[in-house]
């Protein structure tokens, strides 16, 4: 399993509607498939880059899919685990919606937002929202986050917890982040605001 590649950015480009980057690692070029949003944030050709990768192996192909943040890689892995969601559709979803927007759309059952991605129809959007929310809710219970007391029963806390889990943060990190930002977020009822604050705090810790 190749979890990341770091080396010189050799080339980037589109192919068959998909974006990719070739990373030169010790003289070996790794083709890493990604989406336009990631390509737009890459350094210049010849500069060092690190991409967090997920390898998908099929009978006729072995492909690397890469992202600038480990959380986006984890989210991509969650997406392609859903029946009917392949790598191309997973990349289309991440290109259309930023990771936090995508997670919120899934948790809130916003199938209209999910269907904005090319190739994602209404039925696929419904299945995606249903399967991932159910899976993340079970993960949340098993992680112990649901035992946090009265706060855990609130809609905002639940959605933020699930979103952070989907982005690849560990349960312990989620608890610490929410405890840290709670005083400043008192009275705030917008999930997006809580999510931004929690991610900002977690980024500062790294």
Curated annotation (Swiss-Prot):
Cellular component (GO) terms are: cytoplasm; Holliday junction helicase complex; Holliday junction resolvase complex
Annotated region (Domain I), positions in chain: 1-68
One of its GO biological process terms is: DNA recombination
Which stretches does the entry tag as region Domain III?
152-206
State the Pfam families in the record.
HHH_5 (PF14520), RuvA_C (PF07499), RuvA_N (PF01330)
The organism's place on the tree of life at top rank: Bacteria
| Family matches, as InterPro entries | DNA_helicase_Holl-junc_RuvA_I, Hlx-hairpin-Hlx_DNA-bd_motif, NA-bd_OB-fold, RuvA, RuvA_2-like, RuvA_C, RuvA_C_sf
Segments for region (Flexible linker): 147-151
Query: What is recorded about the protein's domains?
Result: Has three domains with a flexible linker between the domains II and III and assumes an 'L' shape. Domain III is highly mobile and contacts RuvB.
Q: What is the name of the protein in this document?
A: Holliday junction branch migration complex subunit RuvA
């Amino acid at each position: 399993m190749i979890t990341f590649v770091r080396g010189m950015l050799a080339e980037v480009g589109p192919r068959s509607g998909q974006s990719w980057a070739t990373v030169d690692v010790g003289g070996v070029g790794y083709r890493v498939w990604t989406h336009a949003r990631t390509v737009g944030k890459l350094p210049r050709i010849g500069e060092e880059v690190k991409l967090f990768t997920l390898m998908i192996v099929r009978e006729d192909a072995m492909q690397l899919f890469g992202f600038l943040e480990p959380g986006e890689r984890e989210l991509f892995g969650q997406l392609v685990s859903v029946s009917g969601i392949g790598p191309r559709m997973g990349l289309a979803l991440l290109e259309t919606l930023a990771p936090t927007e995508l997670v919120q759309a899934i948790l809130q059952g916003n199938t209209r937002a999910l269907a904005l991605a090319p190739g994602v129809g209404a039925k696929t959007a419904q299945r995606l929202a249903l399967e991932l929310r159910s899976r993340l809710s079970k993960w949340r219970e098993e992680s112990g986050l649901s035992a946090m007391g009265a706060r855990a029963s609130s809609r905002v806390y639940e959605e933020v917890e699930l979103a952070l889990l989907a982005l690849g943060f560990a349960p312990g990190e989620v608890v610490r982040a929410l405890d840290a930002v709670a005083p400043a977020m008192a009275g705030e009822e917008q999930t997006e605001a809580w999510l931004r604050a929690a991610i900002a705090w977690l980024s500062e810790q790294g």
